[in-house]
Amino acid sequence: MYRLQIEKIRGFRDFYPEDMDVEKFIFKTAEEAAEAFGFRRIDFPSLEYLDLYRIKSGEELLQQTYSFVDKGGREVTLIPEATPSTVRMVTSRKDLQRPLRWYSFPKVWRYEEPQAGRYREHYQFNADIFGSDSPEADAEVIALASSILDRLGLQDIYEIRINSRKIMEEIIGGMTSSDPFSVFSIIDRYHKISREEFVDQLRSAGIGEDGVSMIADLCSGTRGIDEMARITGKSSEEIARMAAVEDLLASYGVKNVRYDFSIVRGLSYYTGIVFEAYDRSGQFRAILGGGRYDNLASLMSGESVPAVGFGMGDAVISLLLKRENVQIPREKKSVYICRVGKINSSIMNEYSRKLRERGMNVTVEIMERGLSAQLKYASAIGADFAVIFGERDLERGVVTIRNMYTGSQENVGLDSVVEHLISQAT
């Protein structure tokens, strides 16, 4: 008989229970950090009009969309990122009190080459502040990003790297009459291509030899923000603003900040500060990234709404947690209720209900199998305790409680089972 073999689509993931434990940890940690900063959660459709991304996302992103014409003849797409949808929501309501601090955790889709930490479908945490053009807003979103990584147990493996689109426009504007974004697109690929390719692409964009040498040198390493005026030969308001952001970040306790000219971010709507959390080991370049985008709302609605935010994908974070051997905490203690002999299921269900009411997770044996098989299963699902209801023990009014980690066990009276487990779980 022919059997249809259907495999998972390339670039997409299945999440088994142990995978979802990691995802839940990432979601919960990011959400708790965001709400500690006063951010509130939003959500939006997974499907948007394609025109939403034609406004200012850039040609490369448009080519990566999962877009199609629906049955109503409309050009739509699975969302490739969250920012345009979030801005659409901001501009759709005039009664919202600003500044708005919003976060979201949608799935996003991009048709790009899968690789470690990069898939065609992933969850992306996003946090944005709308309605403030201050350095304080810039620093706050970076501090939130840093707080999330620290809470995840990744505090020693990253540094914050920042740049400014305005400063880069000042530098590049004097080198070419071409659209600066075409040069930004090349700089964004600096770490993905050889130096020879990088230099050739800059020349093709109309940059002269002196400019090519300067850009290549600027992108070759990180610097302190206090070096900016000397390096650029400028003393602009934007350089002063970047220094102010650094000082504000220090007051948040974020001190691992470096200036990196190669950080420009690939999307065309950024207007000021841009930043990434950089993996110090070099295995993954950008752990998260974002920046200021003050003009996107006006392109959609004509209303000017300054904004700054960042996005963080789950895939790289999950790989970093594994690499750094971060132990995923268990939210609740769990119990597996076993049966030996002819045991009425009602008594097992009664005690499972009592334990659940006290906040424990309880799984009840529903198969007819030996005790060793039950204990093996309890271990496989990560139960902390096994409560063994034995036919003979019940005649004496006791059950056996086994600690699944130490292997120790003891007999406990039926009237003390719940309190005993609660005391052991705390």
From Swiss-Prot:
One of its GO terms (cellular component) is cytoplasm. CDD domains: HisRS-like_core, HisRS_anticodon. Its EC number is 6.1.1.21. Keywords: Aminoacyl-tRNA synthetase, ATP-binding, Cytoplasm, Ligase, Nucleotide-binding, Protein biosynthesis. GO terms for molecular function: ATP binding; histidine-tRNA ligase activity. It is found in: Cytoplasm. GO terms for biological process: histidyl-tRNA aminoacylation. It catalyses: tRNA(His) + L-histidine + ATP = L-histidyl-tRNA(His) + AMP + diphosphate + H(+). Its main location: cytoplasm. PANTHER family: HISTIDINE--TRNA LIGASE, MITOCHONDRIAL-RELATED, HISTIDYL-TRNA SYNTHETASE. NCBIfam families: hisS. Belongs to the class-II aminoacyl-tRNA synthetase family. This is Histidine--tRNA ligase. The gene is hisS.
